[in-house]
Amino acid sequence: VSDNPFKPELWQPVEGFEDLTDITYHRRLDGGALQPTVRVAFNRPEVRNAFRPHTVDELYRTLDHARMSPDVGVVLLTGNGPSAKDGGWAFCSGGDQRIRGRTGYQYAAGESAETVDPARAGRLHILEVQRLIRFMPKPV
């Protein structure tokens, strides 16, 4: 018996979001029919679901999609787990301090000003995500 409360057979990945790496985005199924509930989950359990700029970008994208979808009535925001390192669970431990530089949070190694949106470089846009959640016209 698994301690994982996520039952994959009850959820279906949302189409168009197959490229997500730091977030998972699913739609609730009941008897094969899609339900008005979506599940947005942090997917970095190895670091207690700490977020980085890429995570925030994906989180904003999924939450905005849920906000704009008229057939979505509820957004469940959670964290995946457990950690493969130690079996621990977490919703989200905050910003990933391993990638925080002197000027703030940095994008992944190998990216440059030419490959990153300049408006997002060097900092997390978590405040925009918080605002999106706060003013979401649906329960989160």
Cite the ranges covered by each PLM segment:
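Conserved CoA-thioester-binding segment of acyl-CoA-metabolizing enzymes
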Residues: V1-S83
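Charged catalytic carboxylate motif
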Residues: H54, E58, H125, L132
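Hydrophobic core positions within the conserved protein kinase catalytic domain
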Residues: L63, Q130-I133
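Glycine- (often His-adjacent) and acidic-residue-rich active-site loop
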Residues: V47, G79-R131
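A short, small-residue-rich loop immediately preceding and capping a beta-strand
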Residues: P137-V140
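Solvent-exposed polar/charged
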Residues: M68, R134-F135
